[in-house]
Amino acid sequence: MFILYLVFMLGIGIWFFVRSKNAGEKDYFLGGREMGAWVSGLSAGASDMSAWVLMGMPASIYAYGMGKAWIPVGLFIGYSLSWIFIAPRLRSFSIVCGDSITIPQYLTNRFKASSRALQIISAVIFLVAYTVYSASSIKACGTLFETVLGIPAQIAMYAAAVIIVGYTFLGGFNAVCWTDFFQGLLMLGSLFAAPIVALCMMQKSGTTAGTLPAGYWNMMTSWQDILSGLGWGLGYAGMPHIIIRFMSVKSDKELKKAAKVGIGWTFFILMFAVLVSVVAHLFLGDGQESSTIFIAIVRRIFTGPWLGLISGLLLSAILAGAMSTADSQLLAASSAFASDVYKPVIRKGQSTDKEMLWVGRIVVLVIAAAALLIASNPGSGTIMSLVENAWGIFGASFGPVIVLSLFWRGFTFSGAAAGIVAGAAVDVLWLVLFKSTGVYEIVPGFAAGLLAAVIASKCSSAESRETAAALFDQCIAYKD
């Protein structure tokens, strides 16, 4: 079943490669801005949640109780607000601002800046953070194959990386979005089926394998849990591989439909992920390896030759989660280097579309190789910690800047540069020096980025403020 699933994903990449031999840079990195509501909505959700929603998050709540449920609460609030407020403006602003196809390109064009400093700074952060983020997805694939099939994790990670790189390398944005569409459906179906069937089996037998620990339902465990959990929602405004979907939708009408699809999918995926952690205590008992509770539930429910096929299909959801996020991250990072460093800085704007496609593909290979090295390192940390670190630096560095660029006329180029640098620096410093406080680094990082962006903008010249304000008004006036 796993093999069939992987072949299907690779087939999508080959299909779009054959169809898009004459495609340009905009088609490869943004789907030509022709994405529909269902594909955009589901692919945004699937690229967001990753295998973490099937392994990392249920594991955290299973191990520590409902105090960690503030994470899905924060995620749902942040995701919903991003679709409602950020998506419509980012789509129209990116079109008016030079038909931008990447986030760094949009930020540079938003201020009519001649300097490429923003693009270069952003691209560097992209490359570093996405390498770490992609490592978490590759690591999840290794855990799955080692637990279910007994295949050594190292071999499994190499195989998964080859498949992910294969269809991303070949098909670009269209292949990534369409594979994410199918993977989003599989993830939701699997997270629904596993806990519900387990509950039905326990109700039928009248017995449970364990009980919930004392205080499990207590969500008011500490102010750090509440603040840090809700702080996860701050990340959405600055998550390039997610918000790039907003820019790719073909019309404002389709965007409104996509928002409903994306928000609805996310609500149910988070709700069932929390349910998995509760059911695991009752159905499996205590003492389970927390990161594999979803795998354990599925394997216990569906046993036997034919039911084993169903088990394989449901467990493919972990592959779906890992692949749907890794492919989006690889493409976002490669587009940042190709469009924001190689084309304007190295080639001085003289590169051809074909050249840009191949540069992007080569960068996909390089980042995937680096991510594989991190994932293969036994000291790289858990899936949860890898996601947490990458999510934090993106949210802290780009979140305030994206929000201000869309909602403040007085925001300037200097403010954007200061916000990105300050947000990233404070996020990393907090992680290194103050992790013991229990406060997620995205919270102080976001606050620092916001403050620096506002102060630097206020200190900018009157001319730069007027230029930014004039373009802001043009963006607001844009209609399909």
Task: For every predicted segment, state its role.
Residues M1-D480:
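Membrane-embedded helix-loop-helix hairpins and adjacent transmembrane boundary segments
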